[in-house]
Amino acid sequence: MKNVCYIILTASIIIFACLNSDIIRSGCTQGLQLWYSSIVPILLPFMLLTGVITSFLRSIQVSKCCAYAIIFIIGLLCGFPTGTIIIAFFYRKRIISENVCQSLLPMCNNISPMFLYNYIYRDHLMEYISFARLIEAVYLPQIIYTVIALTLSCMSSHRSSTSTELLTAATVQVSSDNQSPNSGNPENTYSDIISSSVHNITVIGVYMVIFAIAGNLMCRYFSGDACTIISAYLEIGSGVPILYGMDISTKIKTALILSLTAFGGLSALFQSRDMIRISRLSFIKYTTGKTVCAFLCFIFYMMFL
């Protein structure tokens, strides 16, 4: 009986895809064009740079203060998922605790300033809000969330024993060391950095295509502003134009775009998912943090700006 159900389900999916080939092709083209024109030129150089930095840091001792500085610089300036890469790296080296890593992930795995200015502000929000106000609306709520999360994390760590956390981190470190390439040969190291960066940027493109197709299918079969907003939150690149084109008040439209900017879209969440899970951090906590940041950005803009 199960085999029959699998056959019926497979046939239904294939038939559905054939009947909606135009929508799927349009979504695939849309996702690939955005990936090629906006993501690869901006993100790939920073992914390579992050790989070189982590390769260098692997051979030296890094203090906690230095680790925090590097996390904020890379996480806020290089674009996601580079923030996930560097946070997971310091967690595997046991420089930063699990609770602190979870608290920093939502804010320090963010869109790059270039994408924020060129795509979000210049192409869509310039007529509605100044860039200074945009920075305030996007980052201030995330800073507030991070401060609260870190405070709660510190309170929790004082009440509980750290032995379990250290054991978990040590296990992850051993696993990471066993899986890491031999850094003795610089050519092998740089080749691995390039291969890893190309792999990650390709995975990002695939996720962008998948969620662009899902958004197009959702808009095709469902109607209403609620459905349009939900489809926009699937992928930030295609979602911002969707929100921009909605026939709603300028205030709400701007707040939604800022909220999506802080959230990053489901596509961005899944781009970081594998890196988070390999490091034994919680993807659910990360998703919850991103959702809270998005909600805070929306409320902050609606109430104070």
Task: List each language-model region with its residue ranges.
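Transmembrane helical segments that form the transport core of multi-pass membrane transport proteins
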Residues: 190, 194-261
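Membrane-core helix-loop-helix motifs of multi-pass transport proteins
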Residues: 96-153, 275-299
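Transmembrane helix-loop junctions in multi-pass membrane proteins
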Residues: 17-29, 54-61, 118-120, 215-226, ...
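Alpha-helical membrane segments and immediately flanking helix-loop junctions
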Residues: 64-125, 230-276
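N-terminal signal-anchor module of multipass membrane proteins
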Residues: 2-60, 197
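Cytosolic juxtamembrane amphipathic/interface segments immediately preceding
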Residues: 25-29, 89-95, 180-198
